Amino acid sequence: MKKQNNLRSLAAQAVEQVVEQGQSLSNVLPPLQQKVADKDKALLQELCFGVLRTLSQLEWLINKLMSRPMTGKQRTVHYLIMVGFYQLLYTRVPPHAALAETVEGAVAIKRPQLKGLINGVLRQFQRQQETLLNEFATSDARFLHPGWLVKRLQNAYPTQWQHIIEANNQRPPMWLRVNRTHHTRDGWLGLLEDAGMKGYPHPDYPDAVRLETPAPVHALPGFAEGWVTVQDASAQGCAVFLAPQNGEHILDLCAAPGGKTTHILEVAPEADVLAVDIDEQRLSRVYDNLKRLGMKATVKQGDGRYPSQWCGEQQFDRILLDAPCSATGVIRRHPDIKWLRRDRDIAELAQLQAEILDAVWPRLKPGGTLVYATCSVLPEENRDQIKAFLQRTPDAALSETGTPDQPGQQNLPGGEEGDGFFYAKLIKK
C-alpha cells in the first residue's frame, strides 16, 4: 500500500474531522475508504468506529502519557496515537504490526520527525498498561460518554442509566426487514439458512429478523431484488404503530433515507405516500431505496415547519413524523454522535420538534393517526414533548402508547434487541 494511504493515518484523519470539525463519520469515511484496497476497508471502518466508541479512554491515556497536547498542524498525530492505543487494546492486530504501521502513519501525514515520539508513547503504554487501566477503571472517563450526557441519563433513568451506557458501548446487532410483498418472514429465513446463515425473528415486529452474525448485504438472499432491507428492529416499530392501509393518503415526514417510507409501502402497497425531507442530498437515498424495492412514492424536499410550501392544503389519513432528534438511542450504531452533540442542542431540538408537530397536526384528517417517533432516549424530546403537545392540543388523544402521565412507548438500547426509540401514537378527535 502506498505510504500516503497508510490505513492508520486515514483513520486518524477521519476521527480528527469528526471531533475537531464536527463532521459525521458517515460523511467522512466513504471517501477515505476509496483510498484503500477492498480487503482493508473493514479494518479502516473498525479503527474509525472503535476509536470514536472509546474516545474518552484514549484521550485519558494520552493525557497520562504526554506532558503537553499536540496542537496546530501536529494535531493529527494526537489521533494517530489514539489509533495505536485502540489497536493494542481492542484488536487482534499483532502488537508489533500495530506499532510499526502506526509509527509509519507519521510519514503519510508528513510528520516523519514525530515517528520517535509516537513509538515512545505507544511503548510506554505497553509497559504501564495494567497500572493505567486499573486507574482508568475508577475515572469519570470510564463511561466512554461525555459528562453532560452521563448526567442527563442519570437524571432520566436513575436505575437504568448504566445499562443504557453499557448498551451504547457495544457493537450493534444487524437487523433486517423482510419484504412481505415478496416472502413471508419464515420463508425468507429458510432461504437464509440455505445460504449458510442463521437469523432470528423479532417477537413483536412481524417483518424483523436479527442475523446471528452480521453479513455484507450482497450475501443476503434477494437483497438486490428487494426481498430484504437493512433496518433496525426499533425503526420497524414506526410502520407497525402507524398501521397504514391501502388507499390512504400518508405523509412520511423527515423521511430520508427512506427505510420507513418503503416499509409503509410494503405494509400497504396501494397507499398514496408523500415522503418529505429537508435535506436534498439525503433524498437521493429515498429514491435509491424506492428503486431497489420497485416502489413508487411522491418525494419532495421541504421543511416540516412549513407544510403549505410542499403540500398546499392537502390533508392526510396518517402521518409519520420521525422527528429530528439527538439520536441518543442509536449511539452504538453511530458512536460519533457522542462527540457531535452538545448539551445545548437538546433544548433547540425540542423546540424544533414542537414547531413541526404544531405545523403538521392541522394536516391530519379528523379520525386520522399521527405517529411521533424519535431515536432518542431523552425525555425532553419524547415524553415531555408529547405531554406538552397534548396539553396545548385539545383535539389530540393518545392511542395504544402509554398513559397521559407517561405518554408514548420508550424502547431502550440493549443487547440483541433494537436501538433506543420512542413512539407516541396520536389520534385526531
Swiss-Prot record:
Classification via Pfam families: Methyltr_RsmB-F, NusB, RsmF-B_ferredox
Gene Ontology terms, MF aspect: RNA binding; rRNA (cytosine-C5-)-methyltransferase activity
Keyword tRNA-binding attributed: no
Catalytic activity: cytidine(967) in 16S rRNA + S-adenosyl-L-methionine = 5-methylcytidine(967) in 16S rRNA + S-adenosyl-L-homocysteine + H(+)
Keyword Cytoplasm: yes
GO CC annotations, alphabetized: cytosol
Any one biological process term the GO annotation gives: rRNA base methylation
Compartment list: Cytoplasm
SUPFAM superfamilies named in the record: NusB-like, S-adenosyl-L-methionine-dependent methyltransferases
Superkingdom of the source species: Bacteria
Residue sites binding S-adenosyl-L-methionine per the record: 254-260, 277, 303, 322
CDD domains: AdoMet_MTases, Methyltransferase_Sun
Keywords, comma-separated and alphabetical: Cytoplasm, Methyltransferase, RNA-binding, rRNA processing, S-adenosyl-L-methionine, Transferase
Ranges of compositional bias, category Polar residues: 400-412
EC number of this enzyme: 2.1.1.176
Coiled coil: none
Active site positions: 375
Function statement: Specifically methylates the cytosine at position 967 (m5C967) of 16S rRNA.
Family statement: Belongs to the class I-like SAM-binding methyltransferase superfamily. RsmB/NOP family.
Protein name: Ribosomal RNA small subunit methyltransferase B
Species of origin: Salmonella newport (strain SL254)
